Amino acid sequence: MPGRERVQALVAMVEQGKYVEAIGEFYAEDATMQENGMPPRGGRDELVEGERRMLARHASVCTLPGSTFVLEGDIAVIRWTFVFTHKDGTSFRMEELAHQRWRGERIVEERFFYDPAQLPRGS
């Protein structure tokens, strides 16, 4: 189970925009990630590639400071607020909860929950 400092370090890295690096540092080799209502995808290498593809689709992705989390045993829930800017200059804000199960110091399962009405049409 992670300590509060370990989860805080993840939050700090994501708030600095180091998304790909955070997966390498904090996710287990066999980790799975599941978007809102989608099937899970797995393996740290695939998660890194998925993150790179998401970042390549946008001009920028910013995590707003002030993310909060709850930690209970090996479960952490983090409230994230992101601003995605498309390559045409338009942007949208998205709030989500990330429910994580940790094994020791690494995330083994993560599932995202958000209101899809936040997403622009066609996303």
Pin down the residues of each PLM region.
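A short, polar/proline- and glycine-enriched secondary-structure boundary/capping micro-motif
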Residues: 45, 88-90, 119-123
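A solvent-exposed, acidic/Ser-Thr-rich amphipathic alpha-helical stretch
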Residues: 5, 20-74
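Hydrophobic/aromatic beta-strand elements that line small-molecule binding cavities or substrate pockets
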Residues: 51, 64-69, 82, 95-101
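Residue-level signal for well-ordered, solvent-exposed loop/turn and beta-edge residues enriched
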Residues: 32, 90, 106-108
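Short, aromatic-enriched amphipathic alpha-helices that serve as compact interaction elements
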Residues: 1-18, 26
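Short beta-strand segments enriched in hydrophobic/aromatic residues
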Residues: 27, 82-84, 98, 114
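Short, cysteine-centered beta-strand-loop-beta hairpins and adjacent loop/turn segments enriched
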Residues: 60, 83-93
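Short beta-strand edge/turn micro-motifs at domain boundaries
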Residues: 95-121
